Amino acid sequence: MVPQALLFVPLLVFPLCFGKFPIYTIPDKLGPWSPIDIHHLSCPNNLVVEDEGCTNLSGFSYMELKVGYILAIKVNGFTCTGVVTEAETYTNFVGYVTTTFKRKHFRPTPDACRAAYNWKMAGDPRYEESLHNPYPDYRWLRTVKTTKESLVIISPSVADLDPYDRSLHSRVFPSGKCSGVAVSSTYCSTNHDYTIWMPENPRLGMSCDIFTNSRGKRASKGSETCGFVDERGLYKSLKGACKLKLCGVLGLRLMDGTWVSMQTSNETKWCPPDKLVNLHDFRSDEIEHLVVEELVRKREECLDALESIMTTKSVSFRRLSHLRKLVPGFGKAYTIFNKTLMEADAHYKSVRTWNEILPSKGCLRVGGRCHPHVNGVFFNGIILGPDGNVLIPEMQSSLLQQHMELLESSVIPLVHPLADPSTVFKDGDEAEDFVEVHLPDVHNQVSGVDLGLPNWGKYVLLSAGALTALMLIIFLMTCCRRVNRSEPTQHNLRGTGREVSVTPQSGKIISSWESHKSGGETRL
């Protein structure tokens, strides 16, 4: 029952293209009333739209949309951001190496991004190694820069594929839309200049897998095709249908919002831009599940009410409300006038809000005007209350509307960092914060003494340094000893070098040096 009911859901949820659940159905055309017996009462068949009455049936094959596609086709993808990590080292005189890391961006190529994505998905260690910081090179008393390019893959990044023009829609795209994905160009630009978006499956056309093959019976009247009976046994009318391509496949959009790849000999016009197909998303599937349960419950209530009428031989306004047709199309309307059960042919339409049929107090709008009542009685259990307000039994229950509002408020989508409108990008090509979380931390590093020599070279250098230090110590000690020896000698010379004067016979005072000299000369 449920799989079949899913296929007539578009009949009930005809206004789903507008995003609202039809809370009621009411006749927009109402035929003349005629008296009937209670044995003529019947529960409506909500699985069939009684329409043109074509009788000539012939088998044919067609394609229709898979159950579950109503709003958008999800395309799994990923973003690829190019990052350049730069390591700048400086080695000072004594061998201390200071390393400073910086990150910038570059625009990656699609081929490189595809290879990096395949590495990541396959668990290839080359992807993780590509994200590591570069091993810095260094030279004594020089500044050396070492750079390394990395590709940061962030997934998933889901985009919506528009089946009408095969464009992609996501908030990660600059204008929310990407139309350039094709065989020759398999990527989209994003809000970030150095990030591109690519589909996980390089064959984007495979994402448009929304059709299923079915067999049915074409219904025609003479040479004119009126509609068809699908493989579930449901009749679909072609009245009001228009031509529409989905994912490049030509078909017909029916009045109930469904689509079939059916060709007719009639001259059918192309659909205007506002004529869309009811494409399902997960939220709509949940709502349709509730709709199916509600229809099954309503069917059981109708049968119970009909059984009660037949058993008790009495009819009430409340019981007549269960006999109302729940989907748009032709059906019956029932009422009680002057204690007489009445029936009329009716064509039902969907109602999205109560204001459509209750524009003012005491007015029930049918066919564009206020419908007259008979002693406060309308039809299908609708009556005029003592206070002058129109009372509709179904207005007392808004279960489905509450379910829909609950579903709408409970959707929490997964947001890609670039899809967040509050994201503020840095000026220039400095690395953004959203890629930093996917890369190792960078910070300044200062190494120990390292001159870049091999192990034997280090030992030779240490030995030469120790020998030089020893020679310097010996030299300093030798200098100190010489200084200490010269100081006592100078002190003794200063102690015996006092001036001595003598008085010669001539009475002239001469110095001792002159006296010694003249004495020597005398001796000579």
UniProtKB/Swiss-Prot annotation:
One of its GO terms (cellular component) is viral membrane. Glycans are attached at residues 56, 266, 338. Changing residue 311 to A: In strain: SRV9. Residues 481-524 are intravirion. GO terms for biological process: entry receptor-mediated virion attachment to host cell; fusion of virus membrane with host endosome membrane. It is a single-pass type I membrane protein. InterPro entries: PH_Rhabdo_glycop, Rhabdo_glycop_CD, Rhabdo_glycop_FD. Attaches the virus to host cellular receptor, inducing endocytosis of the virion by using different host proteins including TFRC, GRM2 and ITGB1. In the endosome, the acidic pH induces conformational changes in the glycoprotein trimer, which trigger fusion between virus and cell membrane. There is convincing in vitro evidence that the muscular form of the nicotinic acetylcholine receptor (nAChR), the neuronal cell adhesion molecule (NCAM), and the p75 neurotrophin receptor (p75NTR) bind glycoprotein and thereby facilitate rabies virus entry into cells. Arg-352 is highly involved in rabies virus pathogenicity. Its mutation dramatically attenuates the virus. This is Glycoprotein. It comes from Rabies virus (strain SAD B19). The gene is G.
